Structure formats: structure tokens, C-alpha cells
Amino acid sequence: MSGCGKSEEFGVGPVKEEMKLAPVDAALYTKGELIFTTKCVACHKFGSRLVGPPLKDVTKRRRPEWIMNQILNPLEMTQKDKVSKELFAQYLIQMTFQDVTQDDARALLEYMRAVDEGKLTPKE
């Protein structure tokens, strides 16, 4: 990946430092599951496309910093991040800002990690 700096891998937004992830935290992913069912499920499923892209294995394809920035800063990500621009071109819909805190975004990330690691079945 010569020429790709951390900032490109992290996307555009408040998360600028590399995240050190511990094993999946049950309390955190439980909070994330609740947030997902109230703010994300209208547009996202894990196994198939709904309005937005399917989320299955997103934590294996994208860095945690990128996922956090996409959740926290979707408009600017679509304007400035290469991958987010490609997703916009493919799905023809702008991810909306869901007014989540950085702690909420971290819980959502943990929920996605738990689903991707097979620790729970997604709420869809």
C-alpha cells in the first residue's frame, strides 16, 4: 500500500489516531445493538442490500477508524474519502447523520465486530 497514509485509511473525521481494539466487549455491543435497531436498521442489513450497503464483514474489510468516521461524519466522508465516494456512486444515496456521539459510534462498531465474529445474530 505504498502511498497510502494512515489518514487515507482512517477516512475523514474526528477519529485520527489508531484504535487498539481488545476482544469484543459484551456490554458495549449490547448498547450498539440497541443503537443499531433504532438508528441504522431502516437502511442497513448485514446479509443483503437494503437502502445502503450490506454490513456483513465490514469490520474485516475496513479499519475501525474508517467505520467510526463514516458513522460520525458521513457527509464529509462522501465528499472527501475515496471508498465512501465509491459507495455513494454504487448505492446512489447519502448516508445521513444520525446524531450519535463518539461513544455511540464505538458501541456500533463493537456490535458490528460481534456480528462479524459470529458472537451474535444481527437484528434485521
Question: Where are the model-predicted features located?
Answer:
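Sec-exported extracytoplasmic/periplasmic mature domains
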Residues: T37, V41, K45, K60, ...
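Gly/Gly-Pro-rich "capping" loops immediately C-terminal to redox-active cysteine motifs
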Residues: Y29, E33, K45-N73
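Sequence context of c-type cytochrome heme-c attachment sites
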Residues: M19, K45, K85-L87
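Charged catalytic carboxylate motif
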Residues: W66, D104-A107
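C-terminal motif of bacterial Sec signal peptides marking the signal peptidase cleavage site
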Residues: M1-G3
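Axial heme c-ligation environment in periplasmic c-type cytochrome domains
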Residues: V51-V58, L75-A105, L120, E124
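Electrostatic cytochrome c docking/interface patches
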Residues: K6-I35, V51, E124
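Short pre-active-site segment immediately N-terminal to redox-active cysteine/selenocysteine motifs
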Residues: L28, F36-K39, G47, V51, ...
